Curated annotation (Swiss-Prot):
Keywords: Calvin cycle, Carbon dioxide fixation, Chloroplast, Photorespiration, Photosynthesis, Plastid. CDD domains: RuBisCO_small. InterPro entries: RuBisCO_ssu, RuBisCO_ssu_dom, RuBisCO_ssu_sf. GO terms for biological process: reductive pentose-phosphate cycle. HAMAP family: RuBisCO_S_bact. PANTHER family: RIBULOSE BISPHOSPHATE CARBOXYLASE SMALL CHAIN 1, CHLOROPLASTIC, RIBULOSE BISPHOSPHATE CARBOXYLASE SMALL SUBUNIT. Heterohexadecamer of 8 large and 8 small subunits. RuBisCO catalyzes two reactions: the carboxylation of D-ribulose 1,5-bisphosphate, the primary event in carbon dioxide fixation, as well as the oxidative fragmentation of the pentose substrate in the photorespiration process. Both reactions occur simultaneously and in competition at the same active site. Although the small subunit is not catalytic it is essential for maximal activity. This is Ribulose bisphosphate carboxylase small subunit. Belongs to the RuBisCO small chain family. It comes from the Eukaryota. It comes from Trieres chinensis. GO terms for molecular function: ribulose-bisphosphate carboxylase activity. It holds the Pfam family RuBisCO_small.
Amino acid sequence: MRLTQGCFSFLPDLTDQQIEKQIAYCIDKGWAMNVEWTDDPHPRNSYWELWGLPLFDIKDIASVMFELSEARKSCANGYIRMNAFDASYGTESCVMSFIVSRPSNEPGFYLERTEGAGRFITYTIKRYSVQANAEGSRY
């Protein structure tokens, strides 16, 4: 199962050249970049681990790509995404986010159904890799 989160999620994986073009676009807009990673990309897990420091005043594509390559070396078996943050007044939010690296095997999710009193049913989305492995050893 291929995880689909963020921009470009239904397209094939971006090449480094395509990632550089997206970084250039973000820098031209004046947005700050950062790199995040996780080994639990559950749809409701919006708090991924920040890689290094946010790249606030970086205007060089090569510097951002260096941080990405270092994250890929260290977190090769997890998901890595890039975020762009617009600090302008009135926005002050993440305006672009896309996955740049993923594990070779993505086990997917399953739906767990729990029946309660009076035909009350709750559903929970759970990840196969989390069910079988502890944090840090999921891929």
